[in-house]
């Protein structure tokens, strides 16, 4: 069903009543949908670099408007090819009893703009000027005005946009996350041994996740990994910290008011296999769901197919120390510093065997996608259960070589084989090994049968409030033009309906 109403008063008033019907003991995988890798968005573009749908660098469900949003990142060029950054509004059929999803449809594509100029995925140039360079990775809708708040990896940045995608303001960034080579801002430098970056966020490891408190007063931006200074350099080689940072921002002022330490999974002393966080989702004013993943799974080179690890954990900021002025380097935190508390057991395992073997996931051939990056809690189900939606970033199913030549990446779910071919033409294909390395150019010839572009993936999970210790949605307290209905109507939803709001544009 496409739930027809989004009701602030209803959501707030009947949440306790609805939650009484939730009886399952743990989150349950319901089903998945796979979306063809060649699908276009509604921007009007028809090529890979201006119109191919960029999948879910983040997801957000707006309960005030009953709308789903998906974020595209900096584009297929990895920061080397011009791409107008954008946001997608989409629909899903949601079975009100089971939470099963179907019929993914794009309804609206919004470009991010600063006046007449679009924010672009090209890397900053010159390297000390951020300009309109933008690599969107985290998304929320502000409950008090409906604006979009988007986090970025280049800066890192936190920008507010209005409903048309027009830039409103930039939040102030603390000094310790700004990338510097010595005293000079440098948005493209890398740490040792190859580069000169000495402090701030690592490149391509900026604000990967973003969450909003239920009342909209605070936004929480999370670095994919810790800062350069949180790591260590030994023998000229940089090693990341086992800790990363959650930054708390006051949305009224745009200023950071605290930072918290979050420990990644693993024995250390440094995270392995590219481990970092991909998403953060608020459960209430103190508790969050954080998605961690490694760099293994079905993806473009250099993704290794072996041993993907993608899990979401419940965390609590209550009692955590503000580490705004504390280094997170070393095997342990300084005496007296308390990190966020983290449930030792994952709430969900996105690549559990039972998930990958489900018939709805046949397009993956029993193998897990590399980049799970989006999490959102959707509409309540008819018994009061919560629906959790998870989504992947397929990198547009595009890769490129050192000279900037792009290739489409194709996947065979039966064999698990991958090949890369001429862009938008399945010719001159080259093999990709299980470990992600690329063979001799053209060693496969034209695209063999059984291959298709890497799909985007959405999965639905059903869970009770008890599974997550309760949930408070970001519901607006500002009156608006949305239709009202009673709690009885919510309990009576049992047919597939299309949301009239979701059909329209904002």
What does each model-found stretch correspond to?
Residues 19-20, 152:
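Intrinsically disordered and other compositionally biased segments
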Residues 25-475:
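Sequence/structural signature of beta-propeller domains
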Residues 13, 24-25:
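Long, low-complexity, Gly/Thr
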Residues 9-19:
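Bacterial N-terminal signal peptides
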Residues 493-506:
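C-terminal membrane-anchoring or membrane-association module
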Residues 1-10:
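Bacterial N-terminal signal peptides that target proteins for export
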Residues 476-496:
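A short, hydrophobic C-terminal helix/tail in secreted or cell-surface proteins
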């Amino acid at each position: 069903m496409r739930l027809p109403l989004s009701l602030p008063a209803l959501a707030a008033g009947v949440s306790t009543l609805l939650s009484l019907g939730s009886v399952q003991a743990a989150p349950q995988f319901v089903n998945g949908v796979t979306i063809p890798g060649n699908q276009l968005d509604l921007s009007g573009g028809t090529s890979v670099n201006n119109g191919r749908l960029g999948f879910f660098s983040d997801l957000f469900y707006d309960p005030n408007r009953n709308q789903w949003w998906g974020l595209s990142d900096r584009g297929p060029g990895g920061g080397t090819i011009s791409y107008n950054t954008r946001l997608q509004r989409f629909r899903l059929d949601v079975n009100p009893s089971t939470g099963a999803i179907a019929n993914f449809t794009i309804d609206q594509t919004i470009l991010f703009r600063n006046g007449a100029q679009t924010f672009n995925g090209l890397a900053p140039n010159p390297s000390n000027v951020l300009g309109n360079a933008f690599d969107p990775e985290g998304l929320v809708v502000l409950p008090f005005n409906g604006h979009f708040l988007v986090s970025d990896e280049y800066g890192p940045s936190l920008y507010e946009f209005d409903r048309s995608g027009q830039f409103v303001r930039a939040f102030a960034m603390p000094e310790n996350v700004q990338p510097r080579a010595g005293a000079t801002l440098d948005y493209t430098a890398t740490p040792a041994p190859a580069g000169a970056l000495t402090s701030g966020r690592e490149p391509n490891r900026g604000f990967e996740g973003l969450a909003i408190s239920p009342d909209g007063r605070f936004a929480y931006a999370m670095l994919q990994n810790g800062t350069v200074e949180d790591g260590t350099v030994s023998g000229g080689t940089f090693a990341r910290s086992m800790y990363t940072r959650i930054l708390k921002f006051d949305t009224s002022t745009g200023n950071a008011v605290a930072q918290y330490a979050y420990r990644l999974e693993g024995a250390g002393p440094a995270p392995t296999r590219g481990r970092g966080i991909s998403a953060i989702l608020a459960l209430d004013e103190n508790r969050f769901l954080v998605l961690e993943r490694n760099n293994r799974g079905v993806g473009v080179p250099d993704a290794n197919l072996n041993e993907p690890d993608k899990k979401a954990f419940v965390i609590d900021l209550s009692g955590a120390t503000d580490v705004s002025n504390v280094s997170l380097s070393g095997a342990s935190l300084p005496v007296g510093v308390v990190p966020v508390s983290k449930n030792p057991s994952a709430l969900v395992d996105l690549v559990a065997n039972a998930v990958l073997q489900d018939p709805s996931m046949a397009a993956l051939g029993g193998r897990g996608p590399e980049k799970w990056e989006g999490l959102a809690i959707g509409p309540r189900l008819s018994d009061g259960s919560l629906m959790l939606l998870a989504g992947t970033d397929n990198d547009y199913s595009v890769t490129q070589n050192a000279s900037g030549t792009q290739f489409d990446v194709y996947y065979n779910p039966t064999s698990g084989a991958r090949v890369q071919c001429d862009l938008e033409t399945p010719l001159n294909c080259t093999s990709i090994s299980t470990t992600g390395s690329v063979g001799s150019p053209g060693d496969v010839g034209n695209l063999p049968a059984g291959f298709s572009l890497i799909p985007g993936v959405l999965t639905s999970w059903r869970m009770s409030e008890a599974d997550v210790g309760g949930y408070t949605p970001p519901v607006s307290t500002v009156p608006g033009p949305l239709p009202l209905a009673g709690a009885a109507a919510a309990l009576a939803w049992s047919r597939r309906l299309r949301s009239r709001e979701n059909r329209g544009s904002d």
